[in-house]
Amino acid sequence: MWKFKPILKTTIWGGDRIAPCKGIQTDLDLVGESWELSGVEGDVSVVADGPEQGMTLTDLLSKYGAAILGERNYKKFGTRFPLLIKFIDARQDLSVQVHPDDEMAQRQGQANGKTEMWYVVDAAPGAKLANGFREAVDPADYERLVETGDIEKVLNFCDIKPGDVYFIPAGRVHAIGAGAFVAEIQQTSDATYRIYDYHRKDANGNERQLHTALAKEAINFNDTEGTAVKYVPRNDIPVNVAKCPFFTTNLMIVDEEVMRDYNELDSFVVIIVTEGDGTLLCGADAVSAVPTEMKVKQGDTVLVSASANGLSIVPGDKGLKLIETYVG
């Protein structure tokens, strides 16, 4: 099991909740994102401690290969980690945007597109997210809606609260609203087409670039299915909230020790702690000849190798809430 150093990103819309959530110190202002686990070129995660401390995620995959990723994932992705895990803190509204699917991204010279999901960690009063359209939009009206700033009028805005889950397939127009603090799970891609940005200016006084034409090509104009994922929380039992070709995600509320069996799972597992603290226990596997134990707390993200047969999750006195995600 590994933890990685967070890659903190300052943004014009960023806030001040990420560092307290993770229990870390930073001199940075307006931290909008923490990249928790990343194989994106130029922003590759680095192991925080343990025998491989200082090793990049790419080097770790070069060393252990399928023992970490799983046989199927290693054949498909090699040393390119297939998921990007983030925390996002929005002090202001993020831009209205869309991501391409794999086919379009590859036409643009990128490895893949971006399907993603959000888990709401915290939400200020009145916080909202936009996910898809309220009703189908005529593509012929798209550029007019962007030019007049009326694009927001056709979006499906949802009031949010902690624990809400939203799935965002490639091609769905979306936006994170002011006051939202989310954990994001996505394909490894930084392909984002900005549609509308409230005429905000960067540090040099320039409005940020829009990608109106590319976005039009990427958008599914008939996508009106952006409501929150419906699920019933259950104690000590994983609850599935997302399953797609790119990732499967479960939520867990752990009040008593839980044993997760990964014998039939040909994939790494990522654990994201959203509340509480506890201990993860993993038996000996192809990566570690001895059992390993790791203390975890709110804001931690842990990578568990595919060669692990299972994971024992022991909650602290106040319990533990976590996200479990993998490819498969």
Question: Model-flagged regions — what are they?
Answer:
Residues 98-100, 121-124, 133-135, 146, ...:
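Short, structured patches in soluble enzyme cores that scaffold and shape functional sites
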